[in-house]
From Swiss-Prot:
Keywords: Chylomicron, Endosome, Extracellular matrix, Glycoprotein, HDL, Heparin-binding, Lipid transport, Lipid-binding, Oxidation, Phosphoprotein, Repeat, Secreted, Signal, Transport, VLDL. GO terms for molecular function: cholesterol transfer activity; heparin binding; phosphatidylcholine-sterol O-acyltransferase activator activity; phospholipid binding. Belongs to the apolipoprotein A1/A4/E family. Residues 1-18 form the signal peptide. The keyword Metal-binding does not apply. It comes from Diceros bicornis minor (South-central black rhinoceros). This is Apolipoprotein E. The lineage of its organism: Eukaryota, Metazoa, Chordata, Craniata, Vertebrata. Heparin binds at residues 165-168, 228-235. APOE is an apolipoprotein, a protein associating with lipid particles, that mainly functions in lipoprotein-mediated lipid transport between organs via the plasma and interstitial fluids. APOE is a core component of plasma lipoproteins and is involved in their production, conversion and clearance. Apolipoproteins are amphipathic molecules that interact both with lipids of the lipoprotein particle core and the aqueous environment of the plasma. Residues 83-254 are annotated as: 8 X 22 AA approximate tandem repeats.
Length: 316
């Protein structure tokens, strides 16, 4: 856990990156080309790759080239951004749902706190993308109203606004990425710790079960083999006239049956005792795991608590 939290602190101190002027025109395509702002962005998850495509398209729009200007006059740009935004939020929701399913044996209160944290981060990211789309739709209306006039000042204001929106989008994307990474790391560590604990508890129990099986099965097997040998010898000696031996054989069968029932009853009693010990060992283990998860959530909230849990209404 110490290594996990040390890595988290280093990540948080790294900041969200600088505001960078747009580079040369970048045509949108299937490959995710994030630019210098996202040099440290690791797009390994589907939602991260989808967000990278949104970011790449936004960088191309911000160049405000002649081709971009032509498409802005139509609804093509806003429609494309809408599709990319919907795809991103769909993947974010899927990732969040998968993580919540993997939380395992934690209390409902802890699950609710984790869900609230991720929901707030997800909402901030969605609000950022929605504002980008709304601003471009507004620019489209302003551009159509100024046909035949100079739009240099209008383009300058849009470019400056988009830079601010990109910076906010990057900040909130990294915040969501950090939260997901911390909880996923906690799940992996908790699972590994649980497996080791189970092995420590189940190892002696497995050995005990094997010992009980040996103690029960060996006498029965030896008894059956001895009885079979005696019966075979008597039948051979008698020349197979088994009628006069039937009563004796029946008595021996009943004797073996009684022994089997006695041994089975002993096994049942030992199994019930085994079940009771197993339950008494597992209940503290589950409670300990729930407590560890509650502590993990509190540490995450303290580490990234500088970011509000609700979507800000004030436009930056």
């Amino acid at each position: 856990m110490k290594v996990l939290w040390a890595a988290l602190v280093v990540t948080l101190l790294a900041g969200c990156g600088a505001d960078v002027e747009p580079g040369p025109e970048v045509q949108p395509g299937p490959e995710v080309q994030l630019g210098k702002e996202w040099a440290t962005w690791q797009a390994s998850q589907p939602w991260e790759q989808a967000l990278g495509r949104f970011w790449n398209y936004l960088r191309w729009v911000q160049t405000l080239s002649e081709k971009v200007q032509e498409q802005l006059l139509s609804s093509q740009v806003t429609e494309e951004l809408t599709a990319l935004m919907d795809d991103t939020m769909k993947e974010v929701k899927a990732c969040k749902s998968e993580l919540e399913e993997q939380l395992g044996p934690v209390t409902e209160e802890t699950k609710a706190r984790v869900s609230k944290e991720l929901q707030a981060a997800q909402a901030r990211l969605g609000a950022d993308m929605e504002e980008v789309r709304s601003r471009l739709a507004q620019y489209r209306g302003e551009l159509q109203a100024m046909v035949g006039q100079s739009t240099e000042e209008l383009r300058g204001r849009l470019s400056a606004h988009l830079r601010k929106l990109r910076k906010r989008l990057l900040r909130d994307a990294e915040d969501l990425q950090r939260r997901l990474a911390v909880y996923q790391a906690g799940i992996r560590e908790g699972a590994a710790r649980s497996v080791n604990t189970l092995r420590e508890h189940l190892g002696p129990l497995a050995e005990q079960a094997a010992t009980v099986h040996t103690l029960v099965s060996k006498p029965l097997q030896e008894r059956a083999e001895a009885w079979a040998q005696r019966l075979r010898g008597r039948l051979e000696k008698a020349g197979f006239p088994v009628g006069d031996r039937l009563d004796e054989v029946r008595e021996q069968v009943q004797e073996v049956r009684a022994k089997v029932e006695e041994q089975a009853n002993q096994v049942r009693l030992q199994a019930e005792a085994f079940q009771g010990r197993l339950k008494s060992w597992f209940e503290p283990l589950v409670q300990d795991m729930q407590q560890k998860w509650a502590e993990l959530v509190e540490k995450v909230q303290l580490a990234v608590g500088a970011v509000p849990t609700s979507v800000p209404s004030e436009k930056q």
